[in-house]
Amino acid sequence: MKHRPVHERQSSTESKNLKETTQLIMQSSSDHTHHQLGSNDSPSACMSLPVPQLSAEGSCTVGDVTVDLSSQDSQHVARSNSRRVRPSTHGRSPSRHGHTHSHDASGPEDANDDSREQSNSISEVFHLYKWLEKSFPYILIFSAKLVVQHITGISVGIGLLTTFLYANKCIVNQVFLRDKCSKLQCLWVLVFLLFSSFLLYYTFSSQALYYSLVFMNPSLGPLHFFDALWVVGITDFIGKFFFMGLKCIILLVPSFVMSHKSKGYWYMALEELAQCYCTLVSTPVWFRYLIDYGNLDSGAEWHFGILLALLYLILKILIIFGQRKTSSDCLRLFLSQPNYGTTATKRQCSEADGMCAICQAEFTKPIALICQHVFCEECISSWFNKEKTCPLCRTLISNHSHKWKDGATSLQLRIF
C-alpha cells in the first residue's frame, strides 16, 4: 500500500468538510426563509457561519464567510408588502386627482358665471338705453299731448303752489318779528288768500268744487281718476289757505290781549287741526270714485268697487288712529300751556347783571328756569319753539314737542 502524502490527505479532508458545511448552510437558509414567510412578526436574525476559503496557490487556508440572512429576508418581505400596497395606492390616487380637478374646475366656472351675469346686466341696460333713445321722440309727442289736455289743471296747480309758498313765508317772517311785525302785511296776506280762493271757486263754479269743503260731492257727473285728483288737490290747497288765514287773524291780535307764548300754542293747534282736516276731506271723493268709476253696470264690478271702497276706509281709519297720540298731545299742550320756570326775583336778576342773554336788553317779565338761569319770558318762549334745553347750560327743560309754533304750515299734500 502506497501512502499518500500528509498534505494531500489533509486537503481531501478539508474539501469534504467544506461540502458538508455548504450543504448545511443552504439547508438552514431555506428553512429560515420558510419560517419568515410563515410568520411576519418573527424577529430577523443575522446568522454568521465560518466557511473555509481556498487560496489561489492551491494551499487551503481557513477563513470566515458571513452570510446575512436578515437582509435577504427583509428584502423579500419588502417586495411582498410592496405588491400588497400597490393596488390600494393606485386605487386612492384617482380619487385624489378627481378632487383636485374638481376644485380646480369650480373656480373658473364661478368666474365664468359672474362674468356672464355682469355682461347680461350691461347688455340689458344698453338695450334699455337704446330703446329710450329711439322712443324719446314718441314720448315727447305724447307728453306734449297730455300737457295740452291738462293745461288747465297744471296751470291751476302751479298758481296754488306759488300762492301757498308766498303766504307761508310771509306768515313765518311776521311771527318771528313779534312786536315789530307789520299789521298791514298780515292783513294783505289774509286778503290775498281770500281773494285767491274766491276767484278759483268762481272760475269753476259750474263744477261746484266748494261742496268738497263740507264733505259733499261736487257736480262732475261720472268721476274719473283725474277728476278725483283735480277735486282733492284743489280742496287740499283751499283748506290750507283757510287755516293760514286764521293764523293771520291771530297775528293781528295785539300782544297785550294775547301773549306771544299763547299765540305759539294757537299756531300749533291750528296746524294740527289743518292736517287732520286735510286727511279726512278727501275721503268722500275717493270713496265715490271707487264705487262709480266707469258707470259700473254688472253686479261683479259693483261688488268689486264696494270691496275696494271698504279697504280704502279701513286704511284711512288706521291712518287716523296712528295720528291719535300726536293730536292728543297737542291738545293737552294747548289746554295746559305749561310754564318753563318761575318768576325771577330781583336778586336773581341782579346776579344776571339785569340783562337777558338772548335779546341783550333789560329783563321784561323775567323767568328763572330750573337751572336758575334768567331770561325774558318772550325770549325764552321763542327759544323753546325749536329747542328743549337751556341756551346757556343745555339743561333739559321741556320734553314736549313744540313743532309748528313758529307759524309754519306743512306743504305735504294729502291727496289720498
UniProtKB/Swiss-Prot annotation:
What SUPFAM superfamilies does this protein's entry cite? RING/U-box (SSF57850)
EC number(s) recorded for this UniProt protein: 2.3.2.27
Membrane spanning residue stretches: 146-166, 184-204, 214-234, 237-257, 265-287, 302-322
Q: Where is the composition biased (Basic residues)?
A: 81-100
Q: What are this entry's molecular-function GO terms? A: ubiquitin protein ligase activity; zinc ion binding
Keywords assigned by UniProt, alphabetized? Endoplasmic reticulum, Membrane, Metal-binding, Transferase, Transmembrane, Transmembrane helix, Ubl conjugation pathway, Zinc, Zinc-finger
**Zinc finger (RING-type) residue ranges?**
356-394
Q: Where in the cell is it found?
A: Endoplasmic reticulum membrane
Q: Which CDD domains match?
A: RING-HC_RNFT1
Q: How does it sit in the membrane?
A: Multi-pass membrane protein
List all Basic and acidic residues biased stretches. Answer: 7-19
UniProt keyword annotation of Transmembrane helix present: yes
Catalytic reaction(s) noted: S-ubiquitinyl-[E2 ubiquitin-conjugating enzyme]-L-cysteine + [acceptor protein]-L-lysine = [E2 ubiquitin-conjugating enzyme]-L-cysteine + N(6)-ubiquitinyl-[acceptor protein]-L-lysine
Task: Specify residue ranges for compositional bias: Polar residues.
Answer: 20-45, 68-80
Predominantly, its location class is endoplasmic reticulum
State the residue spans of region: Required for ubiquitin ligase activity and for protection against ER stress-induced cell death: 349-400
Q: What does the UniProt function comment say about this protein?
A: E3 ubiquitin-protein ligase that acts in the endoplasmic reticulum (ER)-associated degradation (ERAD) pathway, which targets misfolded proteins that accumulate in the endoplasmic reticulum (ER) for ubiquitination and subsequent proteasome-mediated degradation. Protects cells from ER stress-induced apoptosis.
Protein name stated in the entry: E3 ubiquitin-protein ligase RNFT1
